């Protein structure tokens, strides 16, 4: 068995990636989220596959097919709610995973980091298109509002929107293509994950100290397989509490009303994991400006390696940067809250202040704090 594991062409790759992989001896539980994301992706692909067997991508039957899955299909309700809440779990792990990368300086592994950003965009696109499929009120109006943002692009905007819609409004053609893309994208994500891991294993993992891990490595199995398993059990516990006790906690009641192009919901909002970006979008009165701010709020991650001015890689021994990091975290919570509120006073002002703070922290305050900490090292 030992020989097969180390010599067989396919087994050898698996062995070098998950069993005999040299891993830093001091990585904490914040490093668990990569494997949890893999588990989430697997769950989403499996549950999605079973949902696709019963779903119909047609405007007249989409809503009733989802109702049919919940009522008539054996365990259809749990598959549907696992898929819906699995997306929330996915984004929760994703945000923590990115936060850990920022805190411990993992963005210095630029290839891995950049593939991660591409993965983030792809997952966001997949989640958005998945939200449209049940064809409830929020599905329809969410699709209309978000796709309409592309019309802010000069010259080609309107044509681009109509091209995406497949007509002059969100209709059957839009739903069909969104289903097709929603089905194929998770497999593209899985391929990108392999590239992400490929680049990571070229350099090896970072560790909480931000120092080179070469001096002390341990095999991934059994140490980190057991550790990841504990994380997985906790994730399953959280997911099951959501699915079995309050499956609609993170959803929108409006999505239990079939899509009606003639009646607009009082407050159009996306799922909770997009609310921070939605708040930034709404905080700018100009349409093009809002769209640019929305894209920048995520694309800003790409320039973080350039903005890294500190002499130390990790924030572990940098109190000023730590303080700003947690301020940024709090700011993102505020933006998430504001994104779910109606557009009225005082929410508009709070949203604008939080949006300005978000960009100021990343672009100005954090690099400045790092420079001050560099000076403090000499004292």
UniProtKB/Swiss-Prot annotation:
Component of the ubiquinol-cytochrome c reductase complex (complex III or cytochrome b-c1 complex) that is part of the mitochondrial respiratory chain. The b-c1 complex mediates electron transfer from ubiquinol to cytochrome c. Contributes to the generation of a proton gradient across the mitochondrial membrane that is then used for ATP synthesis. Belongs to the cytochrome b family. Heme b b566 binds at residues 97, 196. GO terms for molecular function: metal ion binding; ubiquinol-cytochrome-c reductase activity. Heme 1 (or BL or b562) is low-potential and absorbs at about 562 nm, and heme 2 (or BH or b566) is high-potential and absorbs at about 566 nm. The cytochrome bc1 complex contains 11 subunits: 3 respiratory subunits (MT-CYB, CYC1 and UQCRFS1), 2 core proteins (UQCRC1 and UQCRC2) and 6 low-molecular weight proteins (UQCRH/QCR6, UQCRB/QCR7, UQCRQ/QCR8, UQCR10/QCR9, UQCR11/QCR10 and a cleavage product of UQCRFS1). This cytochrome bc1 complex then forms a dimer. PROSITE patterns: CYTB_CTER, CYTB_NTER. GO terms for cellular component: mitochondrial inner membrane; respiratory chain complex III. Signal peptide: none annotated. GO terms for biological process: mitochondrial electron transport, ubiquinol to cytochrome c. Its cofactor is heme b. Keywords: Electron transport, Heme, Iron, Membrane, Metal-binding, Mitochondrion, Mitochondrion inner membrane, Respiratory chain, Transmembrane, Transmembrane helix, Transport, Ubiquinone. It is found in: Mitochondrion inner membrane. Its main location: mitochondrion. It is a multi-pass membrane protein. InterPro entries: Cyt_b/b6_C, Cyt_b/b6_C_sf, Cyt_b/b6_N, Cytb/b6-like_sf, Cytochrome_b, Cytochrome_b_C_euk/bac, Cytochrome_b_N_euk/bac, Di-haem_cyt_TM. This is Cytochrome b. The chain crosses the membrane at residues 33-53, 77-98, 113-133, 178-198, 226-246, 288-308, 320-340, 347-367. A ubiquinone binds at residue 201. Heme b b562 binds at residues 83, 182. Pfam families: Cytochrom_B_C (PF00032), Cytochrome_B (PF00033). Binds 2 heme b groups non-covalently.
């Amino acid at each position: 068995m030992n020989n097969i594991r180390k010599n067989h062409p396919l087994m050898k790759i698996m062995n070098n990636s998950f069993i005999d992989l040299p891993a830093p001896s001091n990585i904490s539980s914040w490093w668990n989220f990569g494997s949890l994301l893999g588990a989430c992706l697997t769950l989403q692909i499996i549950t999605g596959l079973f949902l696709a067997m019963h779903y119909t991508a047609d405007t007249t039957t989409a809503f009733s097919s989802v109702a049919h899955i919940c009522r008539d299909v054996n365990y259809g309700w749990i598959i549907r709610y696992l898929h819906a809440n699995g997306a929330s779990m996915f984004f929760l792990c994703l945000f923590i995973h990115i936060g850990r990368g920022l805190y411990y300086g993992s963005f210095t592994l630029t290839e891995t980091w950049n593939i991660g950003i591409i993965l983030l965009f792809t997952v966001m696109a997949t989640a958005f298109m998945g939200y449209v499929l049940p064809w409830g009120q929020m599905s329809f109006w969410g699709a209309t509002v978000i796709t309409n943002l592309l019309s802010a692009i000069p010259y080609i905007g309107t044509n681009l929107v109509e091209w995406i819609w497949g007509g002059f409004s969100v209709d059957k053609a839009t739903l069909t293509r969104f289903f097709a893309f929603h089905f194929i994208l998770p497999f593209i994500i899985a391929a990108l994950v392999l590239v992400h891991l490929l680049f990571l294993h070229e350099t090896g993992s970072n560790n909480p100290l931000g120092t080179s891990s070469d001096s002390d490595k341990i095999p991934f199995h059994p140490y980190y397989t057991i550790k990841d398993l504990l994380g997985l059990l906790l994730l399953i516990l959280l997911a099951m509490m959501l699915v079995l006790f309050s499956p609609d906690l993170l959803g929108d009641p409006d999505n239990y009303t079939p899509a009606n192009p003639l009646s607009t919901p009082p407050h159009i909002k996306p799922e909770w994991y997009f609310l921070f970006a939605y708040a930034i979008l709404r905080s700018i009165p100009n349409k093009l400006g809002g769209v640019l701010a929305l894209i920048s709020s995520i694309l800003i991650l790409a320039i973080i390696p350039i903005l890294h001015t500190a002499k130390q890689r990790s924030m572990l021994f940098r109190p000023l940067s730590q303080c700003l990091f947690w301020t940024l975290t709090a700011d993102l919570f505020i933006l998430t809250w504001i994104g779910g509120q109606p557009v009225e006073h005082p929410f508009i002002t709070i949203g604008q202040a939080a949006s300005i703070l978000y960009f100021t922290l990343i672009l100005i305050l954090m690099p400045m704090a790092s420079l001050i900490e560099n000076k403090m090292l000499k004292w």
